């Protein structure tokens, strides 16, 4: 265990990614068919061990992504290169996940229409994304795309091939509920999660973020940087 997890434990803090992974652990049943939309090279980039456990639990794990990165995802049984309209199966998947994908979607109605088409009755959809009115999304929305990679590389060591244009058309509770309920889904849960990872590269800055969060939470306030974790169910 490195210094990052130790510091987060000291402040009783779990990252949004932890909650996202936990929601999959809770909802993915043995022999379920799992579709990961926008999965890229890794299902869980920072927890490959858990990703391997969960893909072993599923009967089939399928990925779809317009980036050729998906062809390098070793845990997938099958992969579709393209958007969700490329997915051939209908009424098939028991679990559909979108990890940090919603912010890139240019046509939410088209996306959710295909999610409804490919999801099985009683199936769940988990959306993990950034909240539109957090500082980072506001800054990225106001700056040109060519300027996005440098700060991501500095703060999170992100590779340029993992930086994509952003839209932020389904990044609030209202936007997500409107589009999913329109296509017949039921909202099972929705939470905002404090995201104290912007400065997690350094010990001092991580301590600072978590101290600010602790202070704000004492007054029942959120940390400024927020993520969304929403779960929807098809009747």
Model-based region annotation:
Residues 1, 234-235:
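Short, Lys/Arg-enriched, disordered terminal segments
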Residues 1-95, 195, 210, 224-228:
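Conserved N-terminal segment of class I S-adenosyl-L-methionine
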Residues 41, 68-70, 104, 108, ...:
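Glycine-rich nucleotide phosphate-binding loop and flanking beta-alpha elements
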Residues 84-85, 89, 101, 164-167:
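Residues marking the start of alpha-helices
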Residues 95-101:
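A short beta-strand submotif of the Rossmann-like class I SAM-dependent methyltransferase core
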Residues 106-118, 124-233:
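S-adenosyl-L-methionine-dependent methyltransferase catalytic module, highlighting the catalytic core
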